[in-house]
Amino acid sequence: FYLSAIENFTHNGEVIDKFGEFSAGYMSGWMITLNDWFINMGASEFLVTEGDTISWQYTSNLGEDIGADWMNTSAKITGLNIVGNAGQLSPAFDNEVKSYTLTVQKNIEAIQLKAEANKMSRVQYYVGSVEYKPFNNIPVNNGTVITIKSTYEDTMSGITDTDEITIKV
């Protein structure tokens, strides 16, 4: 699928003739994220599975304006979102901390997570060898260890960052 432009539409009461690739200059166009990661191939190269989140976004600066800074080779996990009131993270999130405890109530059977990182890095969530997607339910019990791994898009570089969360009931 190749989206070059959207034509003849209305936005906030204004008729737009054409909005697309190069409409906002030579560095503008469409970019695609798969689970909050700017993909490194065309959209047709990826198999979408249940739970995937795909977003077509418009950039006017080769992606830097929407989180795809090609010059930033960091895989650093910079934030952690625990959806809802699932529990208390200890210590509080800090870029330099690599190991956390999430204390949950006994009635919590699953949690949903989303880590923040450079969108040129792919963030993956594991319990053992089972991978979960951002915001998908991750089953938890006392002692469950969730590994969050961020890998810079160029996997040959070996640039990664890993955090672990141990569940305490």
Predicted regions and their residues:
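Extracellular beta-rich ligand/substrate-recognition surface
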Residues: F93-D94
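Short proline/glycine-enriched turn/loop motifs at strand-loop junctions of beta-rich domains
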Residues: I108, E116-R122
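Short Pro-Gly-centered beta-turn/loop motif in secreted/extracellular proteins
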Residues: T103-E109
